[in-house]
Every structure is written in C-alpha cells, then in structure tokens.
Amino acid sequence: MEPVLELEDVARSFPRGIVALRQVSLTVGAGEFVAVMGATGSGKSTLLHCAAGLDRPSSGSVRLAGREISRMRERPLTRWRRDRVGFVFQSYNLLSELTVRQNLALPGRLGGPRRRDIDEVLAAVGLGGTGRRPVGELSGGQRQRVAIARALVTGPSVIFADEPTGALDPTTGGQILGLLRRAVDRDGVTVLMVTHDPAAAAWSDRLVLLRAGTVATDAATPDASTIADRLHAVSTAVAR
C-alpha cells in the first residue's frame, strides 16, 4: 500500500512547557481509514493539524501526498493543498448566508469545480436538488453532508476529519460515517479521523490511540466495545 501520509518523529510543544506531541511516527496508506483516539489533552487534534499542514511541528517531518509540507511557506502550501486535501470539522465551517452550491464552489474560486461536478457530488451525499438552498435553512445532519460534499468536490487524496459526528445524533452520525466509508471503499480516498466516540471509530480500518502525546496503540480496528475498553485503559493509565 503506497503511503499517502508519513509523519516521522513529529513533536509539537507550546509556551509554558506544554508538550502536545512527542516524537510521533505514523504512516497511512492510500485508501485507508484511520481513527485517532485518546483522552482529553492526548494530542489528537494537534496530530491531525500537523498532518494536514494546519499547524507546524516543532521538530520532525510530515510528508503528504509525496510532498514534504512541514517546511513549506503558507501560501504555496495552501495552493498545493487545495486540490489534494479535504477537511470536515464538527463545526461544519460553512457560510450560512450562502447557498449550498456557493459553499461548495468556495474552495476552488481560483479555478474550482464545475457546476456539473458540484451537482454530482451533492447527489452522491443525498443532497440532490438542494444546491440553491441557503445553508442556514438546513439541519445539522444536512450541513455536515454539505461539508462532506465540499471535501469531496475537488477529488482529494486525503480527507482530514476532526470530530465529524460530535454534534450529531447517532443515526445521523452513522449516515455521515457511511459517506466517509464509501469515499474510502469506492474512490480510494484516505481518511484520517479524530473522534472520541468508539462507535464512530469502529467504521475505520485502523485505530491509533494516543497517550500523553505518544502512540500507545496502532492496530486493526476492533469492535466498538473493545475500542471503548482500550480507550478507558489508556485514559486510566494517564490519570495515574
């Protein structure tokens, strides 16, 4: 399996002696769905942000889609990432006053997706015919579908998802995870997802558990009950 994402000895520290990541190494292959879990403060979101180029590691290297990104300047990185990376966040990051179609067109204003591509991806996520509706009129589940569509419309190699179901009920959350799973299985997209929910993590192929900024577990994903037990064990070990 060809690597799409490679982190090597990545560390991230902040002022006042806060260390979020400690020499983390992680390789994610093409078409792989990886869930990242851990106790509060374990470094989950920092790992995702460093992997996506949204934050810079204090040391170590990050290769994304074959390119070393940890030392790229911000503007070239943003341009390079536009057609290769999609993002899905718990807060949706959509503009409520704009229509669904306008939100999907935003990531590619400098030569972005065609209208036909937008309509096709909206149909694929179950939002066919909603392109002219303002996002502010949609339910939470529909907004997250728009966010998934926006992530997919440029044909990315990787989707980074930070708690994509955190604000949704279990049924709607399952539908959103099904869309991510389909992107992996049908389109070969790589997904790196941070979640606190064992049921959400169970949709992945691989589970990475963080403990105090280090990788405690990296293995094939078990069932939700076993994930919950492992997460509890890691969290308890940190509390001691």
Task: Go through each PLM region and give its residues.
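Helix-to-loop junction immediately C-terminal to a conserved catalytic motif
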Residues: A52
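Short coil-to-helix segment of the ABC ATPase nucleotide-binding domain corresponding to the Q-loop/switch region
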Residues: L98-A105
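ABC ATPase NBD coupling module
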Residues: I69-V85, S225-A228
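ABC ATPase C-loop
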Residues: L127, G131, A151-L152
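The feature captures the beta-strand-to-loop junction immediately N-terminal to the Walker
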Residues: M37-A39
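Catalytic Walker B motif of ABC-type/P-loop ATPase nucleotide-binding domains
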Residues: I159-D162
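A short, proline-enriched helix->beta-strand linker immediately N-terminal to the Walker B motif
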Residues: V153-S157
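Conserved ABC ATPase signature
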Residues: P134-L138, Q142-Q144
